[in-house]
C-alpha cells in the first residue's frame, strides 16, 4: 500500500460483518478526539463510492446484504482510498454475469481515466480484448511476449 499498489482478488476479501463504508475505509477511518468518528468515516466512504459512480450504495448498508458483484466494486473503492497508482485485479469477473461484468468494466474505465494503471488478470480472452490496452502472455509462469491489444484484434476477428 505504501508503494501505491492496491489489489482486489477473485474471492472478495472484505469483512462481511461490517458495513460497506466500514469496509471501504478499513484501516483509514476518520478520527476525532474520542476515537473513530463514524459519521466522517461514512461520509468519506460515500465520497469514494461516488467517485466510482456508486452513489446508490449507502455506506451504512451491511456488506453481507449486497451482491458479490457489488462487493467486488466495494473492494475496488477500498483500494482507491490509498490513492493507488496501480490497481491489480486478479480474476475479478470470475463470479460475475455479463451485466455485472459490463458494470465492472465501466468502473474500471473511470479508475483508469483518473490516472490509475490497472493490471487485469483473466483467462477470459474476450474480456481481455475488450478492456485492455496491452496484453502480456504467460505460460506456466514464464513470460512469452507482450503486445498491444489493438495489434491482435485483426488476427482475432479473422480466427
Outline where the language-model segments fall:
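Glycine-rich phosphate-binding loops of nucleotide-dependent enzymes
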Residues: 1-159
Amino acid at each position: 500500500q505504501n508503494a501505491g499498489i492496491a489489489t482486489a482478488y477473485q474471492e472478495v476479501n472484505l469483512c462481511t460483518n461490517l458495513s460497506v463504508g466500514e469496509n471501504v475505509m478499513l484501516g483509514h477511518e476518520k478520527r476525532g478526539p474520542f476515537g473513530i468518528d463514524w459519521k466522517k468515516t461514512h461520509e468519506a466512504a460515500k465520497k469514494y463510492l461516488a467517485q466510482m459512480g456508486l452513489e446508490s450504495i449507502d455506506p451504512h448498508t451491511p456488506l453481507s446484504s449486497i451482491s458479490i458483484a457489488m462487493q467486488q466494486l466495494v473492494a475496488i473503492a477500498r483500494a482507491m482510498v490509498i490513492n493507488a497508482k496501480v490497481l491489480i485485479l486478479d480474476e475479478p469477473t470470475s463470479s460475475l454475469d455479463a451485466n455485472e461484468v459490463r458494470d465492472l468494466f465501466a468502473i474500471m474505465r473511470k479508475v483508469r481515466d483518473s490516472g490509475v494503471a490497472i493490471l487485469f488478470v483473466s483467462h477470459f480472452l474476450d474480456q481481455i480484448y475488450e478492456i485492455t490496452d496491452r496484453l502480456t502472455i504467460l505460460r506456466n509462469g514464464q513470460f512469452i511476449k507482450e503486445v498491444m491489444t489493438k495489434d491482435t484484434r485483426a488476427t482475432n476477428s479473422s480466427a
